[in-house]
Amino acid sequence: FHSYLQKHSIPLESVMSKVWNKKIFKHIQENVDQASKDLADERGPCPDAADYGYNERFSNKTAIAPTASISIICGGASPGVEPIAANSYTHKTLSGSFNVRNRYLIKLLEKHGKNTEEVWSGITTNQGSVSHLDFLTDLEKNVFKTAFELDQKWIIELSGDRTPYISQAQSINLFVAADIHKRELHKIHFDAWKKGLKSLYY
């Protein structure tokens, strides 16, 4: 989801991200609902649904799983609905360590004529952030904010907005400082509960 927003220059902390969030997950849910009905017509409803008079093939249809490993295999896409933790980081494997760079940021840096090792070294040193790059506009910096730079209320807000379109649950991670005040931490959890989230991770 975050990769999609970055590709289209949409900050995660924006009304447009809310619009696309609802549009995407409503589209998925509507199509899954239709597929369940179509398969029920073709092969019969599942026993649980049939017992209650519903013509549905599936009783549970959608969930958002943690997809950290899959996102790396898919060329560095953002993991599920989770924001990207860093625009540049070192990925360690059994084969060795290698630098992973945000592919949409690469294109933006090329546009500015700044896709250099020096710039990438600065991004890596700055915990994957682009906030120190004075040649980027405020919009561009907002588009490429890392998970730790984002106001976590937006993660809760977006998660709550997509909840009606998910039949099971979402894997939602929050990115907070180790020294976060307990009052703020309680507020985040309370806001998540008020928005109808079933769970939070880490």
Model-identified regions with their sequence ranges:
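Internal maturation/activation junctions in enzymes
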Residues: 5-67, 138-141
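Short, compositionally biased low-complexity segments
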Residues: 1-13, 81, 130-136
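Catalytic alpha/beta core of large soluble enzyme barrels
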Residues: 62-202
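Generic secondary-structure signature for well-ordered alpha-helical cores
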Residues: 3-6, 10, 26-45, 107-115, ...
